[in-house]
Amino acid sequence: NGAAGQKVLIYGENFGNDPSLIEVTIGGQKAPVVNVQSTVIYCIVPTKAYSGEIQVTIKQGEEIYSAEVAEVKFEYQRQVVVSSLCGATSEQGSNSAKDGPFNDCGSITNPCFMTWDPEDHNLLYDAEDAGDAEGVGQGIRCFDFTNKQVYTMIPKNSFVGSQRCRTIDFYKDDNGKYHMIVGLAQGNVNSTAVMMFDRIEGGTKPCGFTWGNGRVIVQNQGCQAAAIHPTTGDLYFSNYQNSLLYRVKKYVIEEFATGKRTTPVRPGTADDAAQTILKVQDKEWEFNIMIHPTGKYAYFMVINRNYILRSDFNGETFTAPYVIAGVNSNKDTYIYQDGVGNQARFGNPYSGVFVKNPEYAGNSDEYDFYLTDRHNHAIRILSPLGQVTTYAGRGSASLNSNPWGYANGRLREDARFNRPKGIAWDERDNTIYVGDANNYRIRKIGLEEDINE
C-alpha cells in the first residue's frame, strides 16, 4: 500500500532489461518505469491509481505481450493535493472574466477575500479588489457548488464611492435575518468605509436570491477590513492612514438593519459613533482583521509590514495587540522562513481562516490558522502557540528557481501559486479554497479523488 510517488518493485519472469519496452499500469494509470531486470521491475506509483490492479505489458518488435493482471492489488492511499476549481490565466486579465460554469468562466480577477454564505454552505463568496497590482476585480462573485456556476452577486458599480471591496462578513439581526457587511477601501475621509446589503429573495441568479438595498453604514478612509464579532455582534473595522481599529456597537448596526438609522456613522467619541479602540503601530499599517470563531481573540495581519499581531478579547472589546509571528519589516522586504514567533518570516501575510485540528480536541484552542502568504506564493499554517509552517506551494523545483507559477499536484513537491490572497475552509470535507490572484484562478486543496483537474 502507499500513495502516489511511492517506489514499487514488481517481481516476475522474462521482463528483459530495457525500461523503454516495459509498460506498467496501476489502477489503470500508467506508472513511470525507472529500471528493469529479468525478474524485477522498479516503478513509481502514479496518481489516481484508485482501483489498484497491476498490469505489465512488454513490447518485442511488433509484438506486445501482456501478463495477467496480478492477483494482489496495490492498496492506493489518496493524498491531499492542489488543483484548480475554476478560472484561467489570460493576458486580458479582468476583461476575460465572465459569468458561467466552473469550466468556462474566464478569469477570476483579484480574489482577495473569501467566505461562505451563512445560510447556504454551497455558496462561496469572493471579494474582488478593483484597485491594486493584481488587477481589476468584478465586485463580489459567487461560486455556486450546487449549480457549479460562477456569477457576479454584487457588481462593483453597486459600491458607493469606491470599487475596492476588501472583505465580506455577515450580521445576523434580532429577527434572525442576515445582512452582508462589505469593507471598502478609498482615500477620502468623508467617503464609504463599510456598506450593508440585504438578502432579497427572487431574481435571476441560480441561487434564487440576490444581495441588494446597499447602503453606507460607516464613512471613513482607508478601510482594509470590516468584521462582526461572533458573540457581541459589534462591528470592527480598520484604518490604513492612522493604523487604527474602530468599533461600532451592535445596537447601531441593528438600527441600520431595521432601517431605523440611515445616516452613516463616523469616527467620534459618542456612544453611537465609530469609536477608536486601539492603534496598531505607526501610520499606514495595512492590516486585515481575522476574528477567532469563539471571539476570544483576533489576528491583525499586517500585510505591508510582514507580520501578524494577536489581540485578545476582554469580554467587552479587543486589547493591545502583541506579535504572534513574523517581524515588522519594510513593506517591500519579502523573506520566507518557517519558525516560531519572531523567527518566522512572511512576504505580505494577506488573509486567513481558522481550521479545526483534530489533534487539538479538548484543548482551549482547537484551531490552526491557515493563511495566504502573498509574495512568498505559499499557504502557511500558524499554530495557537505561534509555530509557522508551510502547508502548500513553492514546489516543482525542477522547473526553475522561481517559487511562483502555476502547478497542480502534491502540496509541497509539485504545487505552485502566484500571489495567493483569499482563502476559505469547507469543514464538511476539510477542503481549502484559495484565491490565486496572478493565476486568475480559484485553487482547491483536497483529497485527489474529489478533485477535477
Residues covered by each model-derived region:
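Gly/Pro-rich loop segments of beta-rich domains
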Residues: 10, 78-112, 147-166, 187, ...
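Ser/Thr/Pro-rich low-complexity tracts
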Residues: 1-84, 141, 205
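Residue-level detector of Asp-centered blade-edge/turn motifs that repeat once per structural unit
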Residues: 116-121, 170-177, 228-232, 291-295, ...
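Short loop/turn segments immediately following the C-termini of beta-strands
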Residues: 59, 119, 127-131, 183-187, ...
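A short loop-to-beta-strand structural motif that recurs across blades of beta-propeller domains
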Residues: 136-142, 190-196, 243-249, 306-310, ...
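Loop/turn-rich, solvent-exposed surfaces of beta-rich toroidal or solenoidal domains
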Residues: 306, 348-387
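Blade-level signature of beta-propeller repeat domains, shared across WD40, Kelch, NHL, RCC1
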Residues: 417-453
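Conserved beta-propeller blade signature
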Residues: 122-126, 177-183, 234-238, 297-301, ...
